Amino acid sequence: VKEVMCAYNRFEGEPCCGSNRLLMQILRDEWKYKGIVVSDCGAISDFWRKGDHETHPDKETASAGAVLSGTDLECGNNYKSLPEAVQKGLIDEKQIDISVKRLLTARFELGEMDEHVCWDSIPYSVVDSKAHKDLALEIARKSIVLLQNRNNILPLKEDMKIALIGPNAND
């Protein structure tokens, strides 16, 4: 495994992407994981945004906290605040360099820095084609895994009601 995505939810009271226990102690120390940790899209914003986790006061603190907890790459735009976080003394460049080293190592291992790579010649019209989108949808549908079916709750019965709650319930 070269890349792991941390989730939106909390673990032991902390956002998963900012959990030192989850990402550093368990994932990296106990399980000896050496790869990249990337946030789910918008997960770092949830640290400080009103109505979400609200565990950090601002972008700088959230970004520094995520990197210090082992989230190397963010799907979002909070990490743009890392220079301000460095200026405020929330994190130093050496700590950011650890993530940068992991990210660049992965890119070199993938051959992204090689002079000629096969995917350079594939046009966007092919990558973003209907056939590729249809295949991605089929794969997603086939890859959903039910880990437990307690009390045979699935499949849902037509007369059954469920509640969707939380900050992403309307998404």
Positions of predicted regions on the chain:
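Glycoside hydrolase catalytic-domain context in secreted enzymes
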Residues: 1-171
